[in-house]
Amino acid sequence: MAISNISNPMSSLIEVHMPNFAIIGSGAMGSAVAKRLIDHGATVLTYLEGRSEQTIARAKAAGMVPVGHQDLTKAELILSIVPPSEAIKVADLVADISSGMPAPPPFVDLNAIAPKTMQAVAAHFEGSGVEVLDGAIIGGPPVPGKSGPTIYISGDTAEQSRLLEDCGLRIRRLDGPLGAASALKMCYAGINKGFTGLGTAMLLAASRSGAAESLKAELSESLPDVDRKLSRSIPDMYPKAYRWVAEMQEIADFLGENDPAATIFSGMADLFARMAGDVEGSRVLVRQLDEILARPDIDR
């Protein structure tokens, strides 16, 4: 007896909903975070009006979808990944486009800002119904085959950040109030980028004083781990120096005027501003640093 081919409705494929995200900021970090989310099935919206050709090309290469600013609110989470100096401006934009919505999407600030600045960001959303989450990115941009960076989130009582976790990002929720993630970022960046700044300052001082060759030899012999780290981190800093200026100022603000260490990071801000100008200009300092870092170990 022939058996008819009757389709079973239970065997049909179940459509799985994949979330939409919006990312404001299509720099090296923002576009790489977007690519990680997109590779895990998400759609990532972005706003590119007034951005440079390089930024637009980077966003399109990552697969981000350019939309008008109002359409950013169609996302389930809106992420801000911009230089610290732009964090408040982005908060203003998102607060404006979310105004009057019955259920606006949560806003996640992932910028390198001090807790006080994070509180100022949150204040822009008062009365709007927007849930504001405090985030911090520790590590470099996501790359294929590696799980990092780590994104710390505080103030996420409803675990809204789980959507990001489900789409391939490493999320660690902090048991602390809004500002805890920003504080963690300030402390970590103060150590990590502060170390790079300290090395830059001392190598340039050695170059001016005729001690560069001896300093490099001594570092190679007695502090080889420091020597290797500076040899990587200083050249890596050159294209980022302009962004680190505001971050150092945020760290100084985080420490406060009564902490003498705040002056260290005010000085670091000036140092990175000087480096940023050199990178875009004569590159005299860059050449000095590269010459020192390229010196082979010297036998004694």
Q: What are these language model-derived features?
A:
Residues L184-L285:
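Helical "substrate-binding/catalytic lid" subdomain
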Residues M10-T73:
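NAD(P)+-binding Rossmann beta1-loop-alpha1 motif at the extreme N-terminus of oxidoreductases
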Residues S282-R300:
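Short, basic/aromatic-enriched C-terminal tail that caps enzymatic domains
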Residues V67-V108, I113:
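Rossmann-like NAD(P)-binding element
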Residues M1-H17, P83:
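N-terminal amphipathic/basic-hydrophobic helices that include classical n-h-c signal peptides
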Residues I113-K193:
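Rossmann-fold dinucleotide-binding core
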Residues T43, V65, P106, E131, ...:
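Conserved beta-strand segments of alpha/beta enzyme cores
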